[in-house]
Amino acid sequence: MQQRRPVRRALLSVSDKAGIVEFAQALSARGVELLSTGGTARLLAEKGLPVTEVSDYTGFPEMMDGRVKTLHPKVHGGILGRRGLDDAIMEEHQILPIDMVVVNLYPFAQTVAREGCSLEDAVENIDIGGPTMVRSAAKNHKDVAIVVKSSDYDAIIKEMDANEGSLMLATRFDLAIKAFEHTAAYDSMIANYFGSMVPAYHGESKEAAGRFPRTLNLNFIKKQDMRYGENSHQQAAFYIEENVKEASVATATQVQGKALSYNNIADTDAALECVKEFAEPACVIVKHANPCGVAVSNSILDAYDRAYKTDPTSAFGGIIAFNRELDAETAQAIISRQFVEVIIAPSASEEALKITAAKQNVRVLICGQWGERAPGLDFKRVNGGLLVQDRDLGIVGAEELRVVTKRQPTEQELRDALFCWKVAKFVKSNAIVYAKNNMTIGIGAGQMSRVYSAKIAGIKAADEGLEVKGSSMASDAFFPFRDGIDAAAAAGVTCVIQPGGSIRDDEVIAAADEHGIAMLFTDMRHFRH
């Protein structure tokens, strides 16, 4: 099998035209003949490039509003023709060999994401000719290079320059794999979109449509291999979604430190998603996927100091997330005080990075600023299947709370209640969070009975010498019995925020009244397993 194949003729037909003019200019300057279609051909001609319209080459016009452009034997014969084997038949039918195909597909995902997108709009943005050319070229990668990503343009030109206008087989094979991945992802988007509309076509309500497709197709791109997974005997890799805009651990840039481990990524995600809940300067410290300290304040330095005081023992070797730029003073406080695995923030000052550089093992991630959190899906793998649900983006404001006890909360109790309610959303169930003056003072996580989570939160606060009297307590789900309220009262809690909804709500409310506790119902649960 010939390793090198010269590129003498290229067919360019792209929806996303970023970089295509420069790439075409580079190809033309190296003697490559250009074929093109529709808008791509017009753009190249406007830029003064010598380009042949595919319709002129085939002798067959584009038709049906562009639905039929490249579906022609002179196009696909030129792509699929096996060099040295099909030469005679290609010559007989005046089929020119096409050595490179540059294609990206109609923007189906962007179209269906637009508000008010109709079924007709979606249908017209299903590319037919593009995927057909992509698959043809990828199949014949022995002779043809297929380019579906503009990020590959520069590398292709460099390789051609290094190989007298040719591309190596290894490169053509790699490009073919990218092409098959590209068409697989494209078809998956289409199948998912139309699959979600099946209920509507069976006469079900509009609410039934647009939710979950009949068949779920997922495409993720491998970002990195890892030394091991959750445990050292497990192999692992990190895959990310393409074109994610929201600030996340997947899109963050690592500016220093060792490679992230499986557990680092999971814990950093938990910390970052929690800190996003707060508008004020905030710090979240996470250990084993649970917050062990959270605080908001006027500065991230004070927020860090207060979050750390919740549970210094658990903070050792933890993950620290901020929702403001990491400054030098805060970086110095962290490095001087504790061992930390990861620090993640929207940005970091030069002075802060100079300080963290003294501890090269500390991983520092910059995630960028975030706007509104985007809806999406959460997945949980079970043996033989996958649980899928909407992301938990539920929030509750003060105006939505219901006071169900005789006593109303004070302004500070209410602030603390809303604060610890946000934290409880990110604590493993059963979750109990004690908070006072905008900082956590005790967190009980992951217990099988809610009362023990309440007791553990009280123990944590006592161990650190933090005063519970006058604090607020959040519970991620309702109290099935009054014992959790009794435990909180014994610790000194004076305000409770919880979803409500237990068959024993009256008993629980009565317990709160007995202890003089103000109780707020959110009517929203935040289980986290």
Curated annotation (Swiss-Prot):
> Which InterPro entries does UniProt cross-reference here?
AICAR_Tfase_dup_dom_sf, Cytidine_deaminase-like, MGS-like_dom, MGS-like_dom_sf, PurH-like
Modified residues annotated as N6-acetyllysine in this record: 287
- Tell me what organism the protein belongs to: Escherichia coli O127:H6 (strain E2348/69 / EPEC)
Q: Which gene encodes it?
A: purH
Print the domain comment field: The IMP cyclohydrolase activity resides in the N-terminal region.
Q: Which domain of life is it from?
A: Bacteria
Instruction: Enumerate the spans annotated as MGS-like domain.
Output: 1-148
User: Which segments cross the bilayer?
Assistant: none
Report the sequence similarity comment from the record: Belongs to the PurH family.
Per the record's keyword annotation, is Cell division included, yes or no? no
* Cited SUPFAM superfamilies: Cytidine deaminase-like, Methylglyoxal synthase-like
Name listed for the protein in its UniProt record:
Bifunctional purine biosynthesis protein PurH
What is one GO cellular-component annotation here?
cytosol
Reactions this protein catalyses:
(6R)-10-formyltetrahydrofolate + 5-amino-1-(5-phospho-beta-D-ribosyl)imidazole-4-carboxamide = 5-formamido-1-(5-phospho-D-ribosyl)imidazole-4-carboxamide + (6S)-5,6,7,8-tetrahydrofolate; IMP + H2O = 5-formamido-1-(5-phospho-D-ribosyl)imidazole-4-carboxamide
Q: Which GO terms describe its biological process?
A: 'de novo' IMP biosynthetic process
Q: Name its pathway.
A: Purine metabolism; IMP biosynthesis via de novo pathway; 5-formamido-1-(5-phospho-D-ribosyl)imidazole-4-carboxamide from 5-amino-1-(5-phospho-D-ribosyl)imidazole-4-carboxamide (10-formyl THF route): step 1/1; Purine metabolism; IMP biosynthesis via de novo pathway; IMP from 5-formamido-1-(5-phospho-D-ribosyl)imidazole-4-carboxamide: step 1/1
Its lineage opens with: Bacteria, Pseudomonadati, Pseudomonadota, Gammaproteobacteria, Enterobacterales
Molecular function (GO) terms for this protein are: IMP cyclohydrolase activity; phosphoribosylaminoimidazolecarboxamide formyltransferase activity
> What keywords would UniProt list here?
Acetylation, Hydrolase, Multifunctional enzyme, Purine biosynthesis, Transferase
Q: Which EC number applies?
A: 2.1.2.3, 3.5.4.10
